[in-house]
Amino acid sequence: MVGKSVVTLDGLSTNQILDLLHKAEYIDSHRKEVAHTCDGRVLATLFYEPSTRTRLSFETAMLRLGGKVIGFAGAQLASVTKGESIADTLKTVSNYVDVVAIRHPKEGAALVASRAASVPVINAGDGGHMHPTQTLADLATLQSRFGRITDLTVGLCGDLTFGRTVHSLIETLCRFGNVRFVLISPDELKTPQYVIDRINATDNCSYVEVRDLASVIGDLDVLYMTRVQKERFFNEDDYLRLRDTYILDEEKLQLAKPSMAVLHPLPRVNEIAVDVDDDPRAAYFEQVKNGMLVRMALESTVVGDELPGYEPLNSKEVHA
């Protein structure tokens, strides 16, 4: 993976994905030992779209490894306002840094960036397409909660049309197999056909589409909640009509398994009641920590810096 861009997780083998999860676990228990892994390295965070968690997570990951960060947060701060192309920006920034994290509202922007850059580019989310590092955070959370990322019934609820984290997670779980997906959404926000096709192409994965969360929550090992994304709507009336379709509260949680894990890519609006935060099944703030850890693992890997004392996955057993 040294020197390699990560636009989607499809470019990584399942063993490479598992090794990144393994590295993240190691980093969590060896914070002091890895604190100088990336001394002298510089990360550029090029965020053409607003972000809080993802940008800060990428930046904190490099800082905790001993590196430094430059970048911008918002297209209005970039030379795009002067008409500069993504390709030219990346060719320029490649002269300054060792690795780039890019977020952009247009699908395919990360691929364009990776082709133009002479350093590794990590996709921090492009349009409604892919969000590979969020998926790594999701997988790390499943691994820590269940000790595996297969043999699970995973419910995905809310905006399944525009939710890039949903698409990315489904497609990656299909590569490991043995997952039953329960797709919970209003008709207006159903899962895109290309994602359904991916499930259908996997022999040991299956799905059902439903509109009612309460009727299926008791069957779920994982409930992945998403917000209805106002920024994806052209008509505010449509957004307001769909915004409150699914709200997870303690009353609904009474119908769920005691071992179920509630995930959410954040930010939330009102789709998870605040009183759920204290429920032991709430795993979304664990996802935040895991997101930083997997980004530390990924950043150090693509620039070729080895974690002191780390034993590669092939010498240890990790269950998919």
UniProtKB/Swiss-Prot annotation:
Carbamoyl phosphate binds at residues 53-54, 103, 131, 134, 266-267. The keyword ATP-binding does not apply. Its EC number is 2.1.3.2. Pathway: Pyrimidine metabolism; UMP biosynthesis via de novo pathway; (S)-dihydroorotate from bicarbonate: step 2/3. InterPro entries: Asp/Orn_carbamoyltranf_P-bd, Asp/Orn_carbamoylTrfase, Asp/Orn_carbamoylTrfase_sf, Asp_carbamoyltransf, Asp_carbamoyltransf_Asp/Orn-bd. GO terms for biological process: 'de novo' pyrimidine nucleobase biosynthetic process; 'de novo' UMP biosynthetic process; amino acid metabolic process. L-aspartate binds at residues 82, 164, 227. It catalyses: carbamoyl phosphate + L-aspartate = N-carbamoyl-L-aspartate + phosphate + H(+). The keyword Transferase applies. One of its GO terms (molecular function) is aspartate carbamoyltransferase activity. It comes from the Bacteria. Keywords: Pyrimidine biosynthesis, Transferase. Belongs to the aspartate/ornithine carbamoyltransferase superfamily. ATCase family. Catalyzes the condensation of carbamoyl phosphate and aspartate to form carbamoyl aspartate and inorganic phosphate, the committed step in the de novo pyrimidine nucleotide biosynthesis pathway. Heterododecamer (2C3:3R2) of six catalytic PyrB chains organized as two trimers (C3), and six regulatory PyrI chains organized as three dimers (R2). HAMAP family: Asp_carb_tr (MF_00001). This is Aspartate carbamoyltransferase catalytic subunit. It comes from Bifidobacterium longum subsp. infantis (strain ATCC 15697 / DSM 20088 / JCM 1222 / NCTC 11817 / S12). The lineage of its organism: Bacteria, Bacillati, Actinomycetota, Actinomycetes, Bifidobacteriales.
